[in-house]
Amino acid sequence: MSVVRSSVHAKWIVGKVIGTAMQKTAKVRVTRLVLDPYLLKYFNKRKTYFAHDALQQCTVGDIVLLKALPVPRTKHVKHELAEIVFKVGQVVDPVTGKRCAGTTYLESPVDLETTPLAKNLEELSLSTTQ
């Protein structure tokens, strides 16, 4: 009994940039879940791709979307950078669209509305004399 192994030739890949030392090239690590047929458990399988980054806009830690090239540029570079999905350090909450760090939102002082104390007291209809 033989197990049929199929290789995945993905045209679009999402991964994390792990190196940008080469000129106009980003080193991207992609993690996939692979089923072990004997244990029936999924394990992480990592693969490293080299992608052409013409504008050198990637930094280490970015989450990027890669597109397969119809013809390889070099022996190792077979993908190109299509989009930077998330810049490192600039995480955006998908529901609210605000920047966040962990479970707290990062609000700049420009975004905060400042209202005078007298206006807040008028809204509450409080008086200082009783």
Swiss-Prot record:
Give the Pfam families listed for this entry. Answer: Ribosomal_S17 (PF00366)
Q: Where in the cell is it found?
A: Mitochondrion
List keywords of the entry alphabetically.
Answer: Mitochondrion, Ribonucleoprotein, Ribosomal protein, RNA-binding, rRNA-binding
Among the GO biological process terms of this entry, one is: translation
Q: Give each disulfide bond as a residue pair.
A: none
Q: Per the record, what is one GO cellular component?
A: mitochondrial inner membrane
Tell me the superkingdom of the source. Answer: Eukaryota
Record-linked SUPFAM superfamilies: Nucleic acid-binding proteins
GO terms (molecular function) for this protein are: rRNA binding; structural constituent of ribosome
Extract the InterPro entries matched here: NA-bd_OB-fold, Ribosomal_uS17, Ribosomal_uS17m_metazoa
Task: Quote the PANTHER family the UniProt record gives.
Answer: 28S RIBOSOMAL PROTEIN S17, MITOCHONDRIAL, SMALL RIBOSOMAL SUBUNIT PROTEIN US17M
Quaternary structure note: Component of the mitochondrial ribosome small subunit (28S) which comprises a 12S rRNA and about 30 distinct proteins.
Q: Which family does it belong to?
A: Belongs to the universal ribosomal protein uS17 family.
Protein name (Swiss-Prot/TrEMBL): Small ribosomal subunit protein uS17m
